[in-house]
Structures are given as structure tokens and as C-alpha cells.
Amino acid sequence: MAEKKLNGTVIVTYRCNARCTMCNRYKAPSRPEEELSIETIKKLPKMYFTNITGGEPFIRQDLKDIVRELYKKSDRIVISTNGFFTDRIIDLCEEFPNVGIRISIEGLQHTNDTIRGLENGYNRGYATLKKLVELKHPDVGFGMTVQDLNAPDLVPLYKISDELGMEFATASLHNSFYFVEAKNIIRDRPMVAKNFEDLVNELLRSNSPKKWFRAYFNHGLINYIYGQPRLLPCDMAF
């Protein structure tokens, strides 16, 4: 019988250098001694795919050790980050050239820095993306959590990703236990939906079947913000 593997998310810290408007995690950070240890990570099961997230993962000074240990049990690893710690990210990618990097950018410069409460956050994140492209890192992309404030930046950010030749992922504003926030809500749903429609049309103009699938996914997000059933059901925990 084939060995059963999982897809998993490893939250390596609840510390974060950003102050995002949709996330209060920075108000309740973990203490370093509370965070997952290397010994605990060694006990994790085999996985097809592992997402390393936080908090901001690159706050952990031993992140390389964590990645090294997870590669013993995971076929693919992607790290979610705000991209602020450029030197640390590049250093890790040079040692682990197959690791995926996904940088969260919440809009163009003013919008991103307003939402993230992180001075120079956009410039630092974009500089990290550019550096990874220059180094020809094979698995890099960025994405945004769409809300009222940044919806008009959806298509401009997609065009930046297209120029850089990288993945562009989207999510709709939502609540989560690790956000320590339960009041996130999209208020101008028609406006946000219209910007999603514009993105869908841009994606469908592509010759890439993968972008056509992303168009379908983003169409599903319109359903989601109107409280309708998801087109792609979530099967986590099943």
C-alpha cells in the first residue's frame, strides 16, 4: 500500500513586523519559547506539500533549519511572507533553490503600506520579487487579500505580475482564528465584484490554460463575497 501523505500548513511564529488592518495577530504574538521547535517538526508526518507561514516566518532566525528538516518529509515547500526581509529571503533561496516564495502585496505602494501599516513595505516586497526574478528563482509569486480599499488595484497588480512572469494569487477578505479578528467584512460588494470581473476578463485574454483556471477561481470569489456557495469546495480536514 502506498504511503499516505498530507498537505499541511506549518505556522512557525505568530510574531509579525506588519500591522495589517485585517489582522490583529501582532497584538498577540507568540513568545519564541512557545513556537514550534525543530524537535517537534521532526515528528510531523510525511507531506506532499507544506506551506510555511506565520506571523512573518522570516522573523525566525532558525528558518533555514526548519526548511532543512521539512525537506526530509515534504515533496514541496512554499513560504508565505510579506517580503520585507529581502536579504534573509535571498540567502535562504540560495541554499534551497527549489523552495517556493509567495509574497503578500496588498495593493500599489500607498494602498499596500496603508493596509499593512508597514513603512516602505511595498518597495521592500517588490524589491524582493525583482531580486528573485533576477536570480531566476523558479518558484516565486505574489498575491493579495482583496477588500474595499485595494480592489481597484487588482488589475494593476496582475499586470505587474504578468510583466515579471510570475504567479498572481488572490483571496477575498475573511476572518480567521489566527488573525485574532472576527469583524472583517466587504462593504461595497458591487464595486469589489466589478474589479474581480475585470481581473477575470484579463486572465481570459491570456493563452495560458492555467490563467483560465485562475479566472474560474476568481469568478468563484465573486460568489463567495455575495455569500453564495463556493465553486471550488474546500476539502481541508477531510
Provide a role label for each language-model segment.
Residues 1-99, 177, 188-195, 199:
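Conserved alpha-helical substructure of the radical SAM core
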Residues 34, 69, 73, 99-106, ...:
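Radical SAM enzyme [4Fe-4S]-AdoMet core and its adjacent flexible, acidic
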Residues 40-43, 234-238:
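Generic low-polarity alpha-helical segments
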